[in-house]
Design a protein with these regions (language model features):
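Nucleotide-sugar-dependent glycosyltransferase catalytic domains
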Residues: 1-138, 145-156, 160-167, 181
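Glycine-enriched alpha-helix->loop->beta-strand junction motifs that scaffold or abut catalytic
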Residues: 10-11, 185, 223-224
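Generic beta-strand/beta-sheet core signal
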Residues: 15, 92-93, 111, 142, ...
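Generic hydrophobic alpha-helical scaffold/packing signal
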Residues: 140, 144, 159, 170, ...
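Nucleotide-activated donor-binding/catalytic signature segment of Leloir-type glycosyltransferases, i.e.
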Residues: 166, 173-195, 201
Length: 239
């Protein structure tokens, strides 16, 4: 988007949902458990941006040349200057989850988690309502858009954990598919169910660690367990 903004002279604001600006306090979001000190924390962002820019270069080089633009060198950091102005950065993260790093510049802002305040227009499946009303509050287990090489094996592990706990569960398979053992204390969601409607009715929330799901669980005030697959999810698990 920087290249498009540069070509057309359009001001741009950068938004982020997990840390992408180097600082002393936390390493890059994909490696939050490496506690190697301030030097590593800052260097991890340089390495991350170097890899991102290397991948971007494959398709941006031709596009920029076709549009009469120079190809910038790989420099291992974000582009803060564009069209003679400093690009503002807005983080959609609560300072209760990530205190603002002292080393961030004045152009970096933290707005808190973003939430659509449009009144929900949602009618739950009567079977879901009946399940929720039939006993104690269940635990939510969800996978979002995550998939693994063998979701049947993953769901076998989940089924074993559900049986061992004896808890009631609302399960959202997400995009993963896979087969789940037929358990009487489990309701499998079908179709779209808003987290902001569902989570307040849960006992706890167990999920993959997407930024949006994490925010929804925290807004609902529920105990949250993140079992990450990759990307920024280890960061949320570490918080």
């Amino acid at each position: 988007y920087y290249s498009v903004a540069e070509k057309y002279g359009i001001p741009v604001v950068q938004t982020q949902f997990f840390p992408m600006d180097k600082n002393d306090e936390t390493p890059i979001s994909s490696a939050p458990f490496l506690k190697l000190g301030k030097a590593w924390n800052r260097a991890s962002y340089h390495l991350g941006y170097w890899l991102i820019q290397l991948l971007e270069r494959r398709y941006l080089t031709d596009w920029r040349k076709q549009n009469g633009m120079t190809v910038p060198p790989i420099h291992g950091g974000p582009d803060y200057e564009l069209l003679g102005h400093t690009v503002p950065v807005i983080y959609a993260i609560s300072v209760q989850v990530l205190p603002r790093p002292n080393s961030w510049g004045a152009h970096i802002h933290m707005s808190g988690f973003w939430q659509d305040e449009t009144p929900l227009s949602y009618t739950p499946d009567p079977k879901l309502k009946a399940f929720l009303n039939a006993g104690e509050k269940p635990v939510y287990i969800g996978f979002g858009s995550m998939v693994s090489g063998n979701m049947d094996k993953t769901f076998a592990i989940v089924s074993k954990a559900i049986k061992a706990s004896g808890l009631r569960v609302v399960l959202d398979k997400g995009w993963g598919g896979g087969a789940l053992a037929n358990l009487p204390n489990v309701y499998v969601l079908e179709g779209f169910t808003p987290h902001d409607w569902l989570f307040p009715q849960m006992r706890a929330v167990v999920h993959h660690g997407g930024a949006g799901t994490t925010a929804a669980g925290l807004r609902a005030g529920k105990p949250t367990l993140v079992i990450p697959f990759g990307g920024d999810q280890p960061f949320w698990a570490s918080r």
